[in-house]
């Protein structure tokens, strides 16, 4: 068993190194094609080292002592690791940036890492490029996009944070009393070659909250009876612990599945990741014959993917009209919005792509529904009332998900310092944040490459200001 586990690890590391090289090559190619030559230099070792990354690398790739030539391996590292030599690849042109490639979270920066600006620039490109081969569900812009009014101030805390070295911040928007008050975007000489006003940026788990908002519209459209409806009319999850579940329990991440799936481990039985395989595949294998355990907060993405695909199942041919109604007619998006499908399947995944202002447009639509007590607003108030306790042992002022006591309907609720205020939060990997103060008509939207910006100053402090 240990040998088998070691083989899996070696295989993973080998794939990770190959993937890292291909991603660097894609980044360098993008720099060339877009004229960012200030970040490029000719690889003087190209002719000598080309094809050294192949399995049959010849004698020309090695020194007389049998070690690989320093100029042909990454960082001159001649050691032979579990995944072999770290060949530098076949790039004729290479960037002149100080980039660190991480492999312990696949294609993502590990949560606790605090990389330099060069590394952050690479990953900003990579997070967009990583999904280029995924099938997409595309929502076209509104014919009448919402136009924001502005009454801008320069906030020293936000300005300092978005320009300082090693800050991963891409965009900051503060909307209050129907106007944009703070509007900052990363400078051109920082991450601006990758991220602009028209860049569709990845939502990560903010997309979970969008799925809930879509679910509310499906209920109000009569496709689903209520949040207490059971999912026993959907064959994809038959004979699994989710079959007899109420929708509200899956929305609340309390479906009693903690013995079978977690955010850290994926599907416990196999280690398969819930964003990489279809629900049907899980139902026929790891989840077959499973029974739910006691209800408790167990945050992970499979719950959301089940909800999303259940909505698609229930709305059928009307799904596209439902999405157009939400994003084109209500939020009135200015640019294209899309979500991606899982691998080669037709299963939707909660990963959305929007521009910075369109994130704000959707957040405003959510706030307007709540304040106007529409049918969807009543749905939002229902999931707020039906929230569950996260039972966290400690709270940290680093992101809304870690500084809220409750979770309801795919939203983070009950800010620790918020007393009785109605504040709802959306939280995505790498520091993506949308926080809506419903009582004070205030919205904060943050796009970021990674964690590490001063959340306490630019989010928490702003929420405390009346």
Predicted regions and their residues:
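Active-site SXXK
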Residues: 178, 199-226, 250, 307-311, ...
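Active-site-proximal alpha-helical segments within enzyme catalytic domains
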Residues: 303-310, 350-375, 432-448
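Active-site Gly/Thr loop motif
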Residues: 333-334, 385-443
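N-terminal leader/targeting segments and the immediately adjacent pre-domain N-terminus
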Residues: 20-193, 224, 252, 462-466
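Active-site-proximal loop and beta-strand segments within enzyme catalytic domains
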Residues: 161-162, 193-198, 202-203, 218-296
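Active-site helix/loop module of the DD-peptidase/beta-lactamase fold
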Residues: 220-258, 315-354, 371
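Classical Sec-dependent N-terminal signal peptides that target proteins to the secretory pathway
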Residues: 1-21
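Catalytic-site signature segments of enzymes, centered on catalytic residues
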Residues: 185, 197-198, 262-351
